[in-house]
């Protein structure tokens, strides 16, 4: 139980240095499961349903801005109580990780920010609003739901679609499947994503790496380059064969990025500001 939020639902796997994984908007902790399974031999992986998402309740403070989400992550990192925690965030989760790292460097060892940067185009946020607030809100059965998710996320492998269907929806009284993510919370969250992230990235004092999917239409190459120019000291990775949903589409590459980054925390990397691509 955190001071500002409802009780956070979490899944955990493995033993070792702690990693706290933060999902994107409308998603849930289970999108991280393949990455967690790849890292569990060396790390204590914790993934949460963030406020208003999944099986986590609505926050008592009713807030869905960057600071509120970041406080949850930072407070949970401190609660884990095994020294500073590395945050691994995707999309909304990456934004929250950057803000938390800037807010609480005492609790955060480092930040892996996947598919969220400053300078994202307004058109990308408008398209996100349409996807999140539009579309059907209930489904007659699992087949209908799976078909919809496969259409909405064409790049996701079948196992990722199945996890989203199984862990992001529940049956209501009439038997129809509805999202666990609260509709009002999602609208407020999408509005909050438009906050200017540049000041937080500029003052982020803990080690970090910026990650983009090579085919992403959310974080454009121009936006990513601008973020890298803002912080030329930070390493950057472009993951080939992935669009926005890098952790679900390329879990092996994400696990490799996490291992390399965590190794750099233990032993400083030789070349800051290095930008590389994976195939």
For each feature predicted by the language model, list its residue ranges.
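Catalytic histidine-centered segment of alpha/beta-hydrolase-like enzymes
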Residues: 242-251, 255
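Conserved serine/cysteine hydrolase catalytic core
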Residues: 172-230, 235-238
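Serine-hydrolase catalytic-loop signature spanning alpha/beta hydrolases and amidase-signature enzymes
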Residues: 24-34, 45
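Conserved hydrolase catalytic core segment
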Residues: 83-122
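Active-site glycine-rich loops that stabilize anionic/oxyanionic intermediates
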Residues: 16, 24-27, 91
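Active-site loop/oxyanion-hole signature of alpha/beta-hydrolase fold enzymes
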Residues: 6, 11-13, 37-40, 46-88, ...
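Helix-rich cap/lid subdomain of alpha/beta-hydrolase
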Residues: 120-181
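Alpha/beta-hydrolase fold catalytic core
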Residues: 1-19, 40-43, 81-84, 232, ...
